[in-house]
């Protein structure tokens, strides 16, 4: 497990991201796609049920041994919490209540955040806007690994460790790459999360807190669902920077696998993204795609051509509202 990844730098390009032009072409050809730009009527009920399931799980694990607690945190809680982060991703595009109810979407994302254990939703939204606007943008898109990550995590063993540590890199990277002022909503997110955690601790002790945090750290680390982190934008085929996954795990991840469709139309909820492909199959069926997130993780670790450097990067001009 000692072979180093072949890449020593990112894949630098000097063209704009492809999704803006694709969006214009597709809307001109298929105006019916605009009808999909509406709230998802199911997500608020699905998310509410998931939050309640995790609260019930907190009660159930209060008497478990530590070994079994960690097992269930990975096998069950990890799936729920990772899925909740993907619900938060969807809600960050105002898909729960529509663009006319921005505040309600933000507060609902904070509610979905509760089982995660740490405040996350508001900060995610702040940076995710840049990910779409400046896809691959140097110093702007914090989804891109740092140069240190690309340089150090270059062997199979180190890439495996990098996957395990994904929650930490996704949390800390924005502070290093593109630090921003803490907003009032982020403070409120933290206070609500603290109140929830203190309440759970007061009711049932430390084990439920460890369960929730373990569910997040284990579920977002080396876990089958975490294949989407790599599948979405890591360059498995030169010249392609966004990939869709068409496999069964879309059922429990709010269709995050339909990632080419999502970047083409960020305002369409995950629930409706399969319809985009159905309406305009010629824009998607011929593109490289994934069918197994586990295989994605395996290939990322053991293919010498893959590593944190396997990302398309570009210089982007700041939009006027960023100046």
UniProtKB/Swiss-Prot annotation:
Motif (Histidine box-2): 128-132
Organism of origin: Mus musculus
Annotated TM spans: 41-61, 68-88, 210-231
Subcellular location: Endoplasmic reticulum membrane
Pathway assigned in UniProt: Membrane lipid metabolism; sphingolipid biosynthesis
Keywords: Endoplasmic reticulum, Lipid biosynthesis, Lipid metabolism, Lipoprotein, Membrane, Myristate, Oxidoreductase, Transmembrane, Transmembrane helix
pH dependence: Optimum pH is 7.0-8.0.
GO cellular component: endoplasmic reticulum membrane; membrane
PANTHER family cross-referenced by the UniProt entry: SPHINGOLIPID DELTA 4 DESATURASE/C-4 HYDROXYLASE PROTEIN DES2, SPHINGOLIPID DELTA(4)-DESATURASE_C4-MONOOXYGENASE DES2
Main localisation: endoplasmic reticulum
Renumbered ranges of motif Histidine box-3: 259-263
Biological process (GO), any one: ceramide biosynthetic process
InterPro entries in the record: DES1/DES2, FA_desaturase_dom, Sphingolipid_d4-desaturase_N
Function: Bifunctional enzyme which acts both as a sphingolipid delta(4)-desaturase and a sphingolipid C4-monooxygenase.
Chain location of the short sequence motif Histidine box-1 per the record: 89-93
Record-listed E.C. numbers: 1.14.18.5, 1.14.19.17
Domain of life, per lineage: Eukaryota
Name recorded for this polypeptide: Sphingolipid delta(4)-desaturase/C4-monooxygenase DES2
Enzymatic reactions: a dihydroceramide + 2 Fe(II)-[cytochrome b5] + O2 + 2 H(+) = a phytoceramide + 2 Fe(III)-[cytochrome b5] + H2O; an N-acylsphinganine + 2 Fe(II)-[cytochrome b5] + O2 + 2 H(+) = an N-acylsphing-4-enine + 2 Fe(III)-[cytochrome b5] + 2 H2O; an N-acylsphinganine + 2 Fe(II)-[cytochrome b5] + O2 + 2 H(+) = an N-acyl-(4R)-4-hydroxysphinganine + 2 Fe(III)-[cytochrome b5] + H2O; N-octanoylsphinganine + 2 Fe(II)-[cytochrome b5] + O2 + 2 H(+) = N-octanoyl-4-hydroxysphinganine + 2 Fe(III)-[cytochrome b5] + H2O
């Amino acid at each position: 497990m000692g072979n180093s990844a072949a890449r020593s730098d990112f894949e630098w390009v000097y063209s704009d991201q492809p999704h803006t032009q694709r969006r214009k072409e597709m809307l001109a050809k298929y105006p019916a796609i605009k009808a999909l730009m509406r709230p998802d009527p199911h997500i608020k009920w699905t998310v509410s049920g998931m939050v309640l399931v995790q609260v019930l799980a907190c009660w159930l694990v209060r008497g478990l041994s530590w070994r079994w607690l960690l097992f269930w945190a990975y096998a069950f809680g990890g799936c729920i919490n990772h899925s909740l982060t993907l619900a938060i991703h969807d809600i960050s595009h105002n898909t729960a209540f529509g663009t006319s109810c921005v505040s309600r979407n933000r507060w609902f994302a904070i509610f979905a955040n509760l089982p995660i254990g740490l405040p996350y939703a508001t900060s995610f939204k702040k940076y995710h806007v840049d990910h779409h606007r400046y896809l691959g943008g140097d110093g702007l898109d914090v989804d891109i690994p740092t140069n240190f990550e690309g340089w150090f995590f270059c062997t199979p063993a180190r890439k495996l460790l990098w996957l395990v540590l994904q929650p930490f890199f996704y949390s800390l990277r924005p502070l290093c790459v593109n630090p921003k002022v803490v907003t009032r909503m982020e403070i409120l997110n933290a206070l609500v999360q603290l109140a929830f955690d203190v309440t759970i601790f007061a009711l049932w002790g430390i084990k439920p807190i460890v369960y929730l945090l373990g569910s997040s750290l284990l579920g977002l680390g080396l876990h089958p669902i975490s294949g989407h982190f790599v599948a979405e934008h890591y360059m498995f085929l030169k010249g392609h920077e966004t990939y869709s996954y068409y496999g069964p795990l879309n059922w429990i991840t709010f269709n995050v696998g339909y990632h080419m469709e999502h970047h083409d139309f960020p305002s369409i909820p995950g629930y409706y993204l399969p319809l985009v492909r159905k309406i305009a199959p010629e824009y998607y069926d011929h593109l490289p795609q994934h069918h197994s997130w586990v295989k994605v993780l395996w290939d990322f670790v053991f293919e010498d051509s893959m590593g944190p450097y396997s990302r398309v990067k570009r210089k982007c001009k700041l939009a006027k509202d960023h100046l």
